[in-house]
Regions:
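Active-site neighborhood of glycoside hydrolase catalytic domains
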Residues: 2-15
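A cross-family glycoside hydrolase active-site/sugar-binding cleft signature
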Residues: 16-21, 58-60
């Protein structure tokens, strides 16, 4: 989060983290769990370690199928994976 703070301070503006994504492999639940853990870490750190400079986190293409883009957050039959739970856990 040092870079987020640095960019905000240099340009005197709020910053967003854009285009995050984590691997979706429906056959490996541990991969999905790790994606959720990492997204939750990014969300928490962006809120607690940026002195209010970070205004949000944008997940790139969460609804795409893994066969189209491996870093989405939905299953092949277009249902959300546990990765998306990270957003609701931040409320």
């Amino acid at each position: 989060m040092d870079n987020i703070r640095r960019v905000g301070e240099i340009y005197q503006c709020p910053v967003m983290i854009t285009e995050v994504g984590f691997e979706v492999d429906e056959s490996r639940p541990e991969v999905l769990a790790e994606g959720k853990r990492q997204l939750l870490r990014v969300l928490r750190e962006s809120k607690s370690e940026t002195n209010g400079i970070c205004r949000g986190v944008f997940y790139l293409e969460p609804e795409c199928r893994p066969s189209q883009y491996r870093l989405g957050a939905f299953t092949e039959d277009v249902h959300p994976t546990i990765i998306m739970e990270a957003f609701s856990e931040m409320r």
